[in-house]
């Protein structure tokens, strides 16, 4: 392990859904609840079909697959209302999440939320979970204008935080995002999530280290600095 690898980072970037916020169950339930709300019976394959999709894509899929009377825009409006209610009123952090971000902040580490979830949901989620005052930056893919497959997303985050890639860590549950960040020179920590078990082998292989839970933060290479 190199000294830089075990050094206290100047910045830590957190993915939101499945990494910092315990939202997997909500994303499992939301499409099912939406289909029932629209007056249809959910198919067993609904979650598998919608898991990798964004909100507009979910709305379009449900409209097309269930031939809904409601337009795509009306389906999206119903989905948006459900998601906003969750993030603004029901969201919780994953075990160990609050302790980790508070320790990082207490040592002077800059914190960023880097997420593919819309900013309309991300900021209320931080407020709902009581950690909004700890984050120096919220960068969403809709705000950045690119996905986390695009290196420009992480370049933007680093520029706004005023840190170099080797000075930053990314905590993430998606292998594709970890690969993008590592290619830029960021250190990466994979985080287990029940909703992304299919991706876990790739996450373990791609990341510098892996945590079964954020509560295991003492296993981090720089834990002795916290």
Language-model regions: role of each:
Residues 82-86, 110, 161, 224-226:
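Electropositive, surface-exposed helix/loop patches at the edges of structured domains
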Residues 112-113, 190:
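Hydrophobic beta-strand core positions in alpha/beta domains
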Residues 1-10, 102-105, 118-226:
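Asp-based, Mg2+/Mn2+-dependent phosphohydrolase catalytic module
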Residues 93, 114, 146:
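Residue-level marker of regulatory loop/turn positions in helix-turn-helix DNA-binding domains and
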Residues 19, 115-117:
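Conserved phosphate-coupling serine/threonine residues in phosphotransfer and NTP-handling enzymes
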Residues 41, 110, 187:
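Residue-level detector of anion-binding/catalytic polar loops
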Residues 37, 46-49, 65, 87, ...:
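Short, flexible active-site loop motifs that bind/organize anionic cofactors or intermediates
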Residues 5-107:
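N-terminal helical cap/lid subdomain that shapes the substrate entry/recognition surface
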């Amino acid at each position: 392990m190199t000294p830089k690898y075990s050094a206290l980072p100047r910045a830590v970037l957190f993915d939101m859904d499945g990494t910092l916020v315990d939202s997997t169950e909500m994303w499992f339930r939301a499409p099912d609840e939406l289909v029932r709300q629209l007056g249809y019976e959910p198919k067993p394959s609904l979650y598998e079909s919608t898991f990798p999709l964004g909100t507009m894509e979910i709305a379009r899929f449900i409209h097309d697959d269930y031939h809904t009377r409601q337009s795509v825009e009306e389906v999206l409006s119903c989905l948006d209302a459900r998601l906003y209610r969750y993030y603004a009123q029901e969201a919780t952090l994953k075990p160990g999440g609050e302790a980790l971000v508070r320790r990082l902040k207490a040592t002077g580490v800059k914190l960023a939320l880097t997420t593919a979830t819309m900013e309309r949901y991300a900021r209320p989620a931080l407020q709902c979970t009581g950690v909004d005052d700890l984050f120096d930056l919220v960068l969403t893919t809709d705000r950045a204008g690119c996905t986390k497959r695009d290196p420009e997303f992480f370049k933007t985050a680093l520029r706004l935080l005023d840190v170099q890639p080797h000075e930053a860590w990314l905590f993430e549950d998606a292998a594709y995002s970890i690969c993008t960040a590592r290619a830029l020179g960021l250190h990466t920590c994979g985080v287990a999530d029940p909703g992304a078990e299919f991706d876990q082998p790739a996450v373990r292989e791609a990341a510098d280290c892996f945590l079964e839970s954020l509560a295991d933060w003492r296993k981090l290479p720089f834990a002795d600095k916290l």
